[in-house]
Amino acid sequence: MSSISGFLGAIPGAQQILQTMAGSLGLAPLSHPEIASSGSTFQQCGKLELSCQTSYHGQDTCCFNYPGGQMLQTQFWDADPAVGPENSWTIHGLWPDHCNGGFDQFCDSHRKYSNISLILIDAGRRDLLDEMSTYWKDYRGDDPNLWEHEWNKHGTCVSTLETHCYSEYYPQQEVVDYFDKTVELFHDLPTYMTLANAGIVPSYTQTYTRHEVEDALSKAHGATVTVRCRSQRLQEVWYFFNVEGPLQTGKFVPSEPDGQTSNCPAKGIIYQPKTPNKDPGHGHEPTKTRHPHGPTGAPFIGKGNLVVSTMGQQRGCIIGRGTWYSSGTCADFRAKRASGDTFTLSSRKGPCAFKDDIFTCGSYISSPAEFSAEDGKLSYHGNTTFFADKAPKGKVQSDIFVSEADHPIELSIAWRG
């Protein structure tokens, strides 16, 4: 499976093919120093002006961010459930606020995309996708949905990312630029390290004041930051910038908040660790999904549904052909004892198995897979964790994979009899 993924990843995407064609026609190659933006030509700008510090008087909005001239790079600290590396915050987004604190949203329905991963791969930016898979995380386990939401709600409202701002435009190039700049800014703002250097580290016993947290982050940023809490728990930080020039190539200058204020209490802020508390008195136990010594529950028997959950939240079910679906009616499956504590599954379409790593049910399946049950979850070869590329949405279905490979969403499957 990994070799196939590697082969597919090496196939040039549409954008790369267009770029090669441009070179063969005598156009400027993409490595040309005058080409500004991540592989395509961004229009030339004259005198660059700093957004929000300069009033709008008819400037070219391909070179001057307006009306969204106050850029917020926002970061999450999700500890329960734990999301992302234990020694790093994660990305929420990059938001183009108005200079007075207002904002626009969902600004261009014609550029509403639901395939961010494919856009990045097609642009030859698997490196960027890998970074996002590590640091741009959704607490519900649906990273692609968060990426889509951030682009559609906020990215489409950045004036300098309009398609006409590119003199040599390649499809979805502005999408790549948006995510590339957001990840770049995130790495320039190492919140975890900044707090740790000030003696502020995740703890189950130590609490902090709002002044301590804000002071450490604001000094490092060069301007006041906004911190957000939920039930006294530190959860989010917002960094504010004005931009001199376009988002793609402009200079991001730290700025004061645009009216947004911190909501954390003055004292008693909890910075909860992402790692489980080893003190049994707090009731935090690591999640266990593997049971190498065999099944730990009664096998599924009879007629029932296969319900899918991500991050402990129910998110649809499996339908007859074996795909994950979040709308409509769950398919009925029959569980039949195979040997010992194992069983097979079948739907109206036929027996079920993992064919080419994908959960599939159909009359062409000659050797049904044998499953077991562990803590009420479906288990295959001792593992209750399965994987998907993307959570289903509307009428869109998703395949379920047995191996992790390049499938970022983790899920579990329970039996509902």
From Swiss-Prot:
Q: What class of enzyme is it?
A: lyase
Please list the residue ranges that the record marks as compositionally biased, kind Basic and acidic residues: 276-288
Origin: domain of life? Eukaryota
- Does the keyword field hold Metal-binding? no
Q: Where in the cell is it found?
A: Vacuole lumen; Cytoplasm
Q: Which PROSITE patterns match?
A: RNASE_T2_1 (PS00530), RNASE_T2_2 (PS00531)
Q: Name one GO cellular component term.
A: extracellular region
Any single GO BP term = RNA catabolic process
Molecular function terms, GO-annotated: ribonuclease T2 activity; RNA binding; RNA endonuclease activity
Q: Where is the active site?
A: 92, 150, 154
Q: In its keyword annotation, does this UniProt entry include tRNA-binding?
A: no
Cleaved signal peptide residues: 1-22
Its EC number(s): 4.6.1.19
Q: Which reaction does it catalyse?
A: a ribonucleotidyl-ribonucleotide-RNA + H2O = a 3'-end 3'-phospho-ribonucleotide-RNA + a 5'-end dephospho-ribonucleoside-RNA + H(+)
The record's SUPFAM superfamilies line, in alphabetical order, gives: Ribonuclease Rh-like
The family database entries (InterPro entries) matched by this protein are listed as: Ribonuclease_T2_eukaryotic (IPR033697), RNase_T2-like (IPR001568), RNase_T2-like_sf (IPR036430), RNase_T2_His_AS_1 (IPR018188), RNase_T2_His_AS_2 (IPR033130)
Which controlled-vocabulary keywords does the entry list? Cytoplasm, Disulfide bond, Endonuclease, Glycoprotein, Hydrolase, Lyase, Nuclease, Signal, Vacuole
Q: Where are the residues of the annotated region Disordered?
A: 274-296
- Disulphide bond pairs: 45-63, 52-99, 62-165, 107-157, 229-264
Q: Which residues are glycosylated?
A: 115, 383
Free-text function comment from the UniProt entry: Rnase which modulates cell survival under stress conditions. Released from the vacuole to the cytoplasm during stress to promote tRNA and rRNA cleavage and to activate separately a downstream pathway that promotes cell death. Involved in cell size, vacuolar morphology and growth at high temperatures and high salt concentration.
Into which family does the record put it?
A: Belongs to the RNase T2 family.
What is the name attached to this protein's record? Ribonuclease T2-like
Source species of the chain: Emericella nidulans (strain FGSC A4 / ATCC 38163 / CBS 112.46 / NRRL 194 / M139)
